[in-house]
From Swiss-Prot:
<feature type="transmembrane region" description="Helical; Signal-anchor for type II membrane protein">
    <location>
        <begin position="9"/>
        <end position="29"/>
    </location>
</feature>
<dbReference type="GO" id="GO:0005886">
    <property type="term" value="C:plasma membrane"/>
</dbReference>
<keyword id="KW-0479">Metal-binding</keyword>
<feature type="topological domain" description="Cytoplasmic">
    <location>
        <begin position="1"/>
        <end position="8"/>
    </location>
</feature>
<keyword id="KW-0349">Heme</keyword>
<feature type="compositionally biased region" description="Polar residues">
    <location>
        <begin position="167"/>
        <end position="177"/>
    </location>
</feature>
<comment type="similarity">
    <text>Belongs to the CcmE/CycJ family.</text>
</comment>
<feature type="binding site" description="axial binding residue">
    <location>
        <position position="135"/>
    </location>
    <ligand>
        <name>heme</name>
    </ligand>
</feature>
<feature type="region of interest" description="Disordered">
    <location>
        <begin position="134"/>
        <end position="177"/>
    </location>
</feature>
<dbReference type="InterPro" id="IPR036127">
    <property type="entry name" value="CcmE-like_sf"/>
</dbReference>
<keyword id="KW-1003">Cell membrane</keyword>
<feature type="compositionally biased region" description="Basic and acidic residues">
    <location>
        <begin position="156"/>
        <end position="166"/>
    </location>
</feature>
<keyword id="KW-1133">Transmembrane helix</keyword>
<keyword id="KW-0812">Transmembrane</keyword>
<dbReference type="InterPro" id="IPR012340">
    <property type="entry name" value="NA-bd_OB-fold"/>
</dbReference>
<keyword id="KW-0997">Cell inner membrane</keyword>
<dbReference type="GO" id="GO:0017004">
    <property type="term" value="P:cytochrome complex assembly"/>
</dbReference>
Amino acid sequence: MNPRRKSRLKVVMAVLSGLAVAVGLTLYALSQNIDLFYTPSEIIYGKNNDPETKPEVGQRIRVGGMVVDGSVKRDDKTLKVTFDLNDIGPAIQVEYEGILPDLFREGQGIVAQGTLVEPTKLKATEVLAKHDENYMPPELGDQMKKQHQPMGISEADLKGKSERDATQISQPFGENK
């Protein structure tokens, strides 16, 4: 190979190597910002009731649902707030420290983004309130339709206090009674 061709090959290889590194770093950065969307029922049971698809403790997720009436507890000395969130099924607890949106209230639909710190507890870094009480985010509405239409929903389910949910949460993984 002549010297001119060698130098061209070196330049092409350097450009391709730089491009590969840039693509790799971009994909890594994007993977750090991907937050999967779940409903409270999907956190408890897994997507499509498959326990293998439950989010893991420590995973960053987004969860959407309704704030359970009577569940909002505020700390008098700090901006820390805890509340329960459900979607016609079991409720999960959300802990948030900061200023809540003006539209946040009990019975209101919200989306919380944060880290799952326990199987049924989310430490939120951001809380978004819906703008209209009749509005339902499309992804939340679709998930609720898919998951809850075939189920018999009781009044206790609507309030996040179903006995069936309590027994399933307390059972170790894979154990059926």
